[in-house]
């Protein structure tokens, strides 16, 4: 079967975008040589198209064809890696969405060629100049327990908060040491607040956040009922709290306040908050 015969329209024959349900290798090669980009794009979308044909189509001159390759779950990782450098922003965006979506189902085997190439592709995309590409990775991988650690750390250090924030707040891949390193590095505005909102912030992280002096991050920390704040760390907060009104209500609502802390809070909060405090201690 030739591409020319299959794609001719007169006499009720298949339109250019329609291909047989099952494709032989010879048919796929013939369609790949078609002068009609709609045929090549249909081939790039086809679930039966062989990996080597998809790799060939990944270098097609038509963006429509390359985008179809980027979106195809059957595309070999070698072709995906090639497309990470594509000049079309939309193609890299679609590629990022696909690879990030497939990553949770990937077997974490460092010896696997597929795993290694997937990590390489993710690392390239995590440094993409287009914020939306990096944001797609962060949003999709933020709660994936087995996401590649280096990729997650790259996203966590991103210079754009919309990329870094979801990973900093939710990723189980980041260790306490990773988070301490980020806190001490003087990250972008909003990064510490994202860490403060994590579930189960440990005492050392809370102390580092408080030592940073970031008022928004400290407010978020106080508002996080699952965050561990040691008494000595709370004392540092209380030393500055009279002049920071945004801390007052979350301080009043902190779980397990000591009598000493309660007395200090009572000395500076407004009357309506004092009533709440008295009901709690």
Residues of each region from the PLM?
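Alpha-helical scaffold segments
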Residues: 1-281
């Amino acid at each position: 079967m030739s591409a020319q015969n299959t794609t001719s329209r007169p006499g009720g024959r298949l339109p250019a975008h329609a291909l047989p349900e099952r494709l032989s290798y010879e048919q796929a090669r013939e369609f790949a040589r078609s002068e009609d980009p709609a045929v090549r794009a249909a081939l790039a979308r086809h679930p039966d198209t062989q990996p080597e044909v998809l790799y060939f189509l990944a270098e097609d001159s038509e963006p429509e064809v390359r985008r179809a390759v980027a979106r195809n779950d059957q595309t070999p990782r070698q072709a995906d890696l090639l497309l990470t450098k594509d000049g079309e922003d939309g193609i890299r965006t679609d590629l990022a969405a696909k690879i990030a979506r497939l990553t949770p189902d990937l077997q974490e085997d460092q010896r696997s060629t597929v795993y290694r190439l997937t990590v390489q592709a993710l690392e390239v995309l995590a440094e993409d100049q287009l914020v939306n590409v990096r944001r797609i990775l962060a949003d999709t991988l933020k709660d994936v327990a087995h996401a590649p650690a280096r990729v997650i750390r790259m996203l966590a250090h991103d210079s754009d908060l919309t990329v870094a924030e979801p990973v900093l707040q939710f990723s189980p891949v980041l260790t306490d040491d990773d988070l301490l390193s980020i806190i001490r590095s003087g990250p972008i505005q909003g990064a510490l607040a994202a860490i403060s909102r994590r579930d189960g912030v440990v005492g050392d992280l809370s102390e580092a956040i408080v030592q940073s002096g970031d008022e928004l991050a400290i407010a978020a920390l106080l508002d996080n009922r699952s965050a561990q704040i040691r008494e000595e760390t709370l004392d540092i907060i209380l030393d500055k709290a009279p002049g920071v009104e945004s801390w007052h209500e979350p301080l009043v609502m902190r779980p397990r306040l000591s009598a000493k802390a309660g007395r200090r809070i009572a000395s500076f909060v407004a009357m309506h908050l004092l009533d709440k405090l008295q009901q709690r201690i």
